[in-house]
């Protein structure tokens, strides 16, 4: 029976955030037991990306970051938090949330900094000049604090949104990035699959919707994290037509549902879970809905291309 993947992804994301919080607590205890004491200064554990948006599915890996109140790179505080990040990463991997292929983990210095260094980093991000320089930067705007001094996390996000909104070149880069994905349709508007009969719906389905909603949200000061919430807020502001907004929200639901349905089928057959969907294995109704959803993605691309950013 088909399920609404938005509910499932919200539950999965909530669990990932809860596990990340518990991992941070366990990591603190491990360091204390090893004679390294407790946190030297206030800090927060942050979860960016799909889990922060509430949109993770079954093939999720770990994304997390740390902001601490003060301290220099490689100084005593940073060394303590580096050890904490290593423990958090190892704990999450051990319980089935694998290491992030993109390195978005607090064991890595790029995702573990003092508040002052984070503010400097965000300022550098928004002044970058090439779309390829935005790798993993955009997911920070989906982040949520899950443990510790959450005001530290919220302060960073407030700064990121404020700086991003007022920096036109950054908004333009994000928009170029959002327009870059190929919509998987043939000349005759059928679903276009790869040689294995599958489509990467994360890259060619979710990404244009998520990235487009994100850049419009940043530009217009919408602080909703979930893609449907961003789209609805943009529609409420009159920036996206009510009908178009509804179509995009439904497209997001349909694509998530197709991905979850495929993951459940693959799991039953021992196939590694991924974001790749085989339309030929979906029932006719789901396949038709997926075709409509992919077609609707062009609406988002058009909205960004029209200069709504």
Language-model features: locations:
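A nucleotide- and high-energy phosphate-metabolite-utilizing enzyme signature
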Residues: 1-309
